[in-house]
Curated annotation (Swiss-Prot):
Protein origin, superkingdom: Bacteria
Name of the protein in its database record: Isoprenyl transferase
Enzyme nomenclature, EC number: 2.5.1.-
Pfam family, one: Prenyltransf
Co-factor binding details: Binds 2 magnesium ions per subunit.
Biological process according to GO: polyprenol biosynthetic process
Disulfide bonds: none
UniProt-annotated catalytic positions: D40, N88 (proton acceptor)
GO cellular component terms listed in the entry, alphabetical order: cytosol
Organism lineage: Bacteria, Bacillati, Bacillota, Bacilli, Bacillales
Binding site for substrate: 41-45, 53, 57, 85-87, 89, 91, 208, 214-216
Function: Catalyzes the condensation of isopentenyl diphosphate (IPP) with allylic pyrophosphates generating different type of terpenoids.
Family assignment from sequence similarity: Belongs to the UPP synthase family.
Length: 260
């Protein structure tokens, strides 16, 4: 199966290299309302340049701003970025400490622009394990942009798809146990309201950078019918052309949701 996926990815990459899309081209087609991105490759980007891994993470922060601005200009309604997974705590302490400072640096630097651009900041994930300084920066950004009604910039921070599903199942089980919910009333629609993304539509497009072909425990429920675009480009090298390319590939797909 893995070989089949790799062959398919190589075919997609070869085909993609034949076309280049402009912003005007993309605006003529369907724009995904919700785009999710697994921002991968910061460490490898730094290693290729004989730099510490944290240099790659810092460079990747600049790409977050550029991508957010472009997505907003194109009319995307929700941009969800996988910033830190529940498994990332296993990394070296120095790297984790730096990653926990990045949201603070990003928001302190770019929050005025996000407010001006009518972007609303949100977060999904287990906030209880986050350092106080990280949480303060996020809470301020969420509060300062709460009245904005433009694109939602949704950071998945200390997030894990399996944990999210288990938590939702436990909440539903508690309601059944206490008698406030009949088990027969539980369906996909109700289950979705117990997820961290309860108020958001599912992503139509998932992009992963760095050439890896896996979900890494990201939005396992929500991406059931998402279109996937895998690119070999490392996240710090991800530019406007690459984002437009992913959207162009999305617009060439036929989304049938199990039909013909």
């Amino acid at each position: 199966m893995l070989n089949i996926l790799k062959n398919w990815k190589n075919q997609q990459t070869a085909a993609s290299n034949l076309e280049r899309y402009t912003k005007e081209d993309i605006l003529k087609g369907e724009i995904p309302e919700h785009i999710a991105i697994i921002m991968d490759g910061n460490g490898r980007w730094a290693k290729k340049r004989s730099l510490p891994r944290i240099a790659g993470h810092h460079e990747g922060m600049k790409v977050v701003k550029r991508t957010t601005k472009l997505a907003n200009e194109l009319g995307v309604k929700v941009l969800t970025l996988y910033a830190f997974s529940t498994e990332n705590w296993k990394r070296p302490k120095m790297e984790v400490d730096f990653l926990m400072k990045l949201p603070e640096e990003f928001l302190n630097t770019y929050l005025p622009e996000l407010v001006e651009e009518n972007v609303q900041v949100r977060i999904i994930g287990d906030e209880t394990a986050l350092p106080a300084h990280t949480l303060r920066a996020i809470e301020k950004a969420v509060q300062d942009t709460a009245q904005n009604d433009g694109m939602i910039l949704n950071f998945a921070l200390n997030y894990g798809g399996r944990t999210e599903i288990v938590s939702a199942a436990k909440s539903l089980a508690e309601k059944v146990k206490e008698g406030s919910l009949n088990i027969e009333d539980i369906d996909e629609s109700l289950f979705s309201t117990y997820l961290m993304t309860e108020s958001l539509q599912d992503p139509e497009l998932l992009i992963r950078t760095s050439g890896e072909i896996r979900l890494s425990n990201f939005m396992l429920w929500q991406v059931a019918y998402s279109e996937f675009v895998f690119t070999d480009v490392l996240w710090p090298d991800f530019k406007e052309d690459h984002f437009l390319q992913a959207l162009g590939e999305f617009q060439q797909r036929g989304r049938r949701f199990g039909g013909i």
